């Protein structure tokens, strides 16, 4: 009965059933395709494109296109996709995640849906986790696409914008996720449309989709610029923090890794820095530096979170174990770590543009992916990306043995046991792969193996340059490899001669990861394509995962039972403790990512509006009509700011409106009070607008239209970019402090949303105001680059604007508020 219900309601079963019917049709064409000449087979591409132009859909040509790509793969790379790979390709084409075990040929599988979707001419992006894999796959799998007459591009970090344009214009593009995101941000900072590199985002296939869309979802992509900040602040804060004692001067939450001063710590800070009150508003910057120094010294660990290489602090990717050169911790944390380690303190940066992977990849018209481990995170993929996880059957049954965890009271006993197990298996010639979470663990085990004179290789962030070479030999007889956090993912470990008879590859986990999915990735390195294999995790109650989630009770039980450091226990109750801890962390991390997305959605909506505004400016030959409409909007804001309490203008309002218009907008055709006095607000707006446009058009009459258009675009882009960068910083500060609203029984997210949109509306009003003022008060010089014109326009206006401010040292109650809100002072900051 249960099986019948499962078949009726299980989406995955129904999808696989549908895919199998299509796969049967594709398979039936195999003999027909194999008889075609190379020229005849390749000619199908043009035929498919013609059919699509004539109104057929991808669904109409799917079976034939898959069959053509399958045969082309066999002729170009000597591999014909198996039946299970056809199922995987279909799952990917329909916007799902294909979960395929290690060694099942994901790289070849994605060729089938990529070929089909590339026939539309709108572009297909195949995303990998690093440039090594992008380069390898673009050459290896790229030969199939080229054989079929499609163009293949490779997007690398060092390419010029022209080379990137050529790559993005190809039918198939191989790229890393980072480079795609940064190109998108850079495209929305250009001042000429011909400098953009990306086309509209059509279809994307993400390899190792769990790593990119889940593990890296909390890390935003940031393009930043330098800001001046004294290094002394970092060194002073670091010196003070190093003098503090845990639980007396500061406390650290093991679960969240949050570090904060106690009352005693605050008192010592006031004494150290000679302050009356540390939390006075004037000491905000100092408090920020102290908090970052606390985090740097007590929550961030050398060789775990970062390494020091050539006198620089380099971030370690927590999910791959690779170094992230060119990336920096934000908000001054990177500089705090540099002060901690005694290396040169780099200039702090200011965010110029930012986006999360979550929001970037959701912009694609169609998104799909593939990985060996995604089922445990299906809820997240479904809720955030609208993708289902389809588990693809293996080509051959998995015969790998996954042993129950061995639990030890302490780390020392656990490490000794791991070394003994390696020694025993190495003596038999069986290859061993040891997975560690931290660099320091890999180096500790390496030292222990060296003492035992066991030859081995270490693969971590410090020697990642030999990654491919080390992984290539990891399955050979007698090989011992220690890898940090699955460095080497994306490259299969193939068994050497005689290894199958020894039991295949032995995988040892030195501790459980926070996520069961990462553990499954480590297990998946063994037993590929029906090979034998063995996996086992060695766990201690001193491991970080169990320390954070209450292992003290169980450690006490082991002690009472008489278990010593080197004695292991295999018990379902203890194994459930580990799994329970992992589920808690996974749930917590999912909540964090959902919360991050909720907050980022606020910024994302605002980002889309700003970027749409920029693109409108770049894509139109002329924005002159838009500029004139902007003048009217700004004049309306001036007049409407005097209508807060009434629908009619008062006598003093007319004088204030007149002064604002004459000072900020008009040059030659200034207005007299008699021209607007007593008129309806709409008539006042029309009168000022007519004079403003007359003034502006007269200024432009000797200027060629193309120069005028260039000038208007330059000023508009510069103003928008300046305010947007400032707004990013403002929203970041709002986000940092919004959590405190919870103490006032207010939803922090709701408060952030409402206040964020209020700030955004005010920014839009200021953008409109400044564009109007700059254009009306600036002189136009011909034959200047757009950037130079914009900078000059802004510089000139800044001086003029300063003069206006100097006219009155006292702000009147009915004056426009200096904060730029557009309201009267008495109804804004003068309350």
Please place each PLM-identified region on the residue numbering.
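Hydrophobic, well-ordered secondary-structure elements that form the walls
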Residues: 434, 482, 724, 760, ...
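Extended, charged helical/alpha-beta scaffold domains that provide interaction surfaces
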Residues: 33, 307-314, 320-327, 529-530, ...
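Short Cys/His-rich zinc-binding micro-motifs
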Residues: 807-826, 830
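Active-site-adjacent structural elements in folded domains
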Residues: 110, 418, 802-804, 812
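Conserved P-loop NTPase motor core
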Residues: 1-562, 611-612
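Short, Lys/Glu-rich amphipathic helical modules
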Residues: 429-442, 620, 646, 673-677, ...
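Generic detector of short, well-ordered, non-transmembrane alpha-helical segments enriched
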Residues: 377, 430, 478, 606, ...
